[in-house]
């Protein structure tokens, strides 16, 4: 768990939640000035500066970790995710699922990269930490934000999409079934509508 601070009581609660499953909780407290160059651009009422820790995992987490699975706190896991965990990350920075807003031209125009790279949702990310360290993903995120702050709207998600534009692998929708697909539906004209339908029913 990466956080600016957690009380002993909070740590105990989290350890007690993990203990029955034979899991250990590790806590990482980054330096207070680590996020000083960033600012919240959107959803400020429900997102804190801590969202930018996601850009900095390669410098926060120990080098003994080669990869890490990041999950937003509202993710519900309904089955075995070992298949996703075992995704081949050779030569890429992360495995991810396309975002529900991937077809919005505005995103690519604003961020200045080609639409053919698509746009992923950062709520579920299988991160290749070795790749991030080698390619200094954290430094790239900082530099982009400092250089083009006006381009950023969806906070760290925008930054990671730019930096990992050509260095990611997409996985099936079932690994990150975003709530918008249930609220707005999926265009039934798409060729793989039947596959999408199955993933909606069995995420």
Predicted regions and their residues:
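Catalytic core and acceptor-binding pocket of nucleotide-sugar-dependent glycosyltransferases
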Residues: 95-102, 117-203
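GT-A fold catalytic core of metal-dependent nucleotide-sugar glycosyltransferases
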Residues: 29-35, 50-104, 126-127, 133-135
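Short, charged/polar "capping" segments at the starts of alpha-helices
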Residues: 5-12, 104
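Short internal beta-strands
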Residues: 1-5, 96-97
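Active-site-proximal specificity loops/subdomain of glycosyltransferases
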Residues: 9-10, 15-60
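A short acidic (Asp/Glu
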Residues: 9-13, 81, 181-183
């Amino acid at each position: 768990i990466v956080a600016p601070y957690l009380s002993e009581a909070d740590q105990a609660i989290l350890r007690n939640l993990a203990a029955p499953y034979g899991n250990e909780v590790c806590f990482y407290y980054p330096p207070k000035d680590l996020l000083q160059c960033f600012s919240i651009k959107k959803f400020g009422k429900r997102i804190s500066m801590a969202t930018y820790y996601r850009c900095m995992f390669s410098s926060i987490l120990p080098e003994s970790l080669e990869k890490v699975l990041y999950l937003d706190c509202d993710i519900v896991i309904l089955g075995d995710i070992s298949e996703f965990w075992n995704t081949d990350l050779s030569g890429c920075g992360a495995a991810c699922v396309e975002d529900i807003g991937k077809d919005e031209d505005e995103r690519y125009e604003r961020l200045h990269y080609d639409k053919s790279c698509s746009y992923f949702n950062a709520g579920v990310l299988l991160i290749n930490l070795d790749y991030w360290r080698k390619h200094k993903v954290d430094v790239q995120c900082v530099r982009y934000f400092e250089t083009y702050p006006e381009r950023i709207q969806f906070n760290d998600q925008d930054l990671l999409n730019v930096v990992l534009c050509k260095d990611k692998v997409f996985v099936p929708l079932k690994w990150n079934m975003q709530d918008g697909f249930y609220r707005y539906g999926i265009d039934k004209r798409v060729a793989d509508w039947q596959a999408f339908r199955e993933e909606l029913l069995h995420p």
